[in-house]
Amino acid sequence: MGKVIGIDLGTTNSCVAVLEGGEPVVIPNSEGNRTTPSVVAFGKDGERIVGEPAKRQAVVNPEKTIISIKTHMGSDHKVAIDDKNYTPEDISAMILQKIKADAEAYLGEAVTDAVITVPAYFTDSQRQATKDAGKIAGLNVRRIINEPTAASLAYGLDKTDEHQKILVYDLGGGTFDVSILELGDGVFEVLATNGNNNLGGDDFDQALMDYIAEAFKKQEGIDLRKDKMSLQRLKEASEKAKQELSSTMTSSINLPFITATNEGPKHLNMDITRSKFDEITSHLVEKTMGPMRSALKDAGLSASDINKIILVGGSTRIPAVQQAVKKITNQDPHKGVNPDECVAVGAAIQAGVLTGEVKDVLLLDVTPLSLGIETLGGVFTRLIERNTTIPSKKSQTFSTAADNQPAVDIHVLQGEREMAAGNVSLGRFELSGIPPAHRGIPQIEVTFDIDANGIVNVSAKDLGTGKEQKITITASTKLSDEEIEKKIKEAEEHAEEDKMQKEKIEVRNQADSLVYQIEKTLKESEGKIDKEEEGKVTAELEKLKKAVESDIVEDMKKAIEDVNTVFHAISQKLYEQAAQAQEAEGQEQAGDDNIVDAEYEEVKDEETQGEDEK
């Protein structure tokens, strides 16, 4: 069996590693570098250029150069090049093909299998898209693993006998994740995860780029962002300045001939201090603090419980980021892992776990958001709670909401709001062919199954007929830039409102069910119930129906209580009547048994008498 490689498919840069002699080794690319820019370009003749060469030619070919495609994974985004549309999966596959070829050149053998990392907060469709990109690139993706979890493997492989809690802060080029893990006895267990799929180093570049562009516009009256070539030069200069400011206090930006007017060429010369950069990007650093606090809260830990802080991603080299993390955790981050390479190293270790090369290591990851379905009244019914360890399988039985309902619509959702409308729709499917029956009678078993890749499969089965429908969620989540990050925050802000609305729907459903059951019982027990008592129940039922129309929770609750009180006496009498009928039937059967015994004894006597006569 060939080697299984570990790939960190990043927004800005990608990296690949493999286990050699039980130790993870980062594979250099064909240019001799340990990371590869996640950039794809198309030359004049349609030639495909990937990695460092693509990044180098971006200034002269901005329209046919694609960067940060990872931010569009799982969406219907298209890149139009030379009258052809490319999906994010297509572009990502080109990067993966380059990585695959470099790995094959290094190993001297064909590579067919890989473990690929994704941000912990990637949705189901984004994970599926990553797996599809691997398939397009000719790779059998053995496992999708979360980036912070991979980083923890890189950190803790030689510390499996130690018991500690670690916080992984992963700020990449386009995504941000934070995960809390517990490490001990070879088990890497994720306790909680949080993040933002649309926050990363690119946003820091953009903030600095906008500041420089506005300053130039104020001075020269020209907006450099309107010219694609000037914009690309400005972007590269901003990225370089950001990197320099991690180790120096000032960075000089010099872009001669950045643009031209009738008066002649214009040059851009500007000094950026670290304090100015920190001021420009302070809101971005602060955006990472919320998910960090939420992850600690979800894990049931305080900052003092954390033993080690692991920083992952090139953007964590920014001093302001390190200071912000230290401010919350009251400790310096661990410097023992390479933030650019540790995710790929962790992926290679996971590959070794899958092949059996690495033993006594167990990885327990979690799902970042709750999963469930929409039920009567638009309520979101959770089947799998957020931060549940995966793989996980959970079933729950539901029923029909109307008499003779021939089909049920299963609407699959992801999020933290109590009402379905406040969550993300992942997809829907229909289970049809349900035999005619009163509502509440059919038993529909809905099963959610999340595999180790975090990909969701949902099935619905009619337990009466055995009919079943399944769906693998592949639909785009269609989320705007900050929707996923806002899910839990929105849930907290709207918790009371959602709780009241959910209670109202549940009480209304309870009332409807009670009316249905009692009216059914009255009809089936006609002639067995005292007319006066039946009249009392009917009157209370009418009051309950009016209370439901009023939509006031307290009125509905009181009406339900009143109906139950009046109906209790009738149900008691019906129970006693049924018990008496059963007792009478039992006595009748006992009488029949006695007659049979008597006949048997008489026959025996006759035979005995006959023998005596002989």
Curated annotation (Swiss-Prot):
Keyword Zinc-finger attached: no
Residues modified to Phosphothreonine: T175
Molecular function terms from GO: ATP binding; ATP-dependent protein folding chaperone; unfolded protein binding
A Pfam cross-reference name: HSP70
Gene3D superfamilies, alphabetized: 1.20.1270.10, 3.30.30.30, 3.30.420.40, Actin, Chain A, domain 4, Substrate Binding Domain Of DNAk, Chain A, domain 1
Biased composition (Acidic residues): 590-614
UniProt-listed InterPro entries: ATPase_NBD, Chaperone_DnaK, Heat_shock_70_CS, HSP70_C_sf, HSP70_peptide-bd_sf, Hsp_70_fam
Keyword terms of this UniProt record: ATP-binding, Chaperone, Nucleotide-binding, Phosphoprotein, Stress response
Ranges of Low complexity composition bias in the record: 579-589
Organism domain of life: Bacteria
UniProt-annotated stretches for the region Disordered: 579-614
Record-annotated disulphide pairs: none
Induction remarks: By stress conditions e.g. heat shock.
Similarity comment: family membership: Belongs to the heat shock protein 70 family.
Function: Acts as a chaperone.
Protein's UniProt name: Chaperone protein DnaK
